[in-house]
């Protein structure tokens, strides 16, 4: 009997410590109505737009901001440039191929603080089923308070992801710029801690 209790001690300790560890991690909630995911491409006729359907989560394992993981999932078919013709072309197999690969995703692999409120966030970017490493550059406000904003920018070469076609009568560049504006609030746990 005594041996059985001793054998159970590690499992009991893990069960007791797990809630304490989780309670020490801040929990954030992104507010979609106050957030946007936009893109732009230089062209003979300006191409810029946003995605109307997407989801973003920001999770932490401790109050240290560099332990965070940013996970963004975008529904490619929700693209909106204000032009039905452009939207249909971008949804097609020449660009997003939304019918076969409905999600555009970015998931961070680490967060590196580069200044008092700036961060480089390398991660895996996937579009059209092609995944490559890309980096979001973030400017964050409200760190350490109950709410804040994140402005992230990233640029990628569309041809790296198999988007080699053009749009009829429009000359477009290869470089695509993405801007992510996220507003969120801390719903539980301690404030985030950053280096000054």
Describe each PLM feature range.
Residues 1-4:
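Positively charged n-region of N-terminal signal peptides that target proteins for export
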Residues 6-8, 162:
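General helical structural elements
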Residues 8-18:
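Bacterial N-terminal signal peptides
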Residues 22-196:
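Low-complexity, acidic/polar, glycine-enriched regions of mature
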């Amino acid at each position: 009997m005594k041996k059985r209790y001793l054998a159970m001690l590690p499992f009991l300790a893990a069960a007791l410590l797990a809630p304490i560890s989780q309670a020490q991690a801040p929990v954030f909630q992104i507010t979609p109505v106050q957030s946007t995911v936009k893109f732009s491409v230089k062209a003979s006729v300006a191409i810029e737009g946003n995605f109307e359907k997407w989801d973003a989560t920001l999770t932490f394992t401790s109050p240290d901001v560099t332990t965070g993981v940013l996970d963004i999932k975008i529904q490619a078919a929700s693209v909106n440039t204000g032009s039905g013709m452009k939207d249909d072309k971008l949804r097609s197999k020449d660009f997003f191929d939304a019918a076969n690969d409905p999600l555009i995703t970015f998931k961070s692999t680490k967060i590196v603080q580069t200044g008092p409120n700036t961060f480089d966030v390398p991660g895996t970017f996937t579009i059209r089923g092609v995944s490559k490493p890309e980096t979001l550059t973030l400017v964050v406000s409200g760190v350490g308070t109950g709410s804040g904003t994140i402005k992230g920018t990233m640029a990628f070469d569309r041809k790296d992801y198999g988007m080699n076609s053009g749009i009829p009568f429009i000359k477009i560049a290869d470089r695509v710029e993405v801007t992510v504006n996220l507003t969120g609030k801390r719903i539980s746990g301690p404030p985030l801690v950053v280096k000054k």
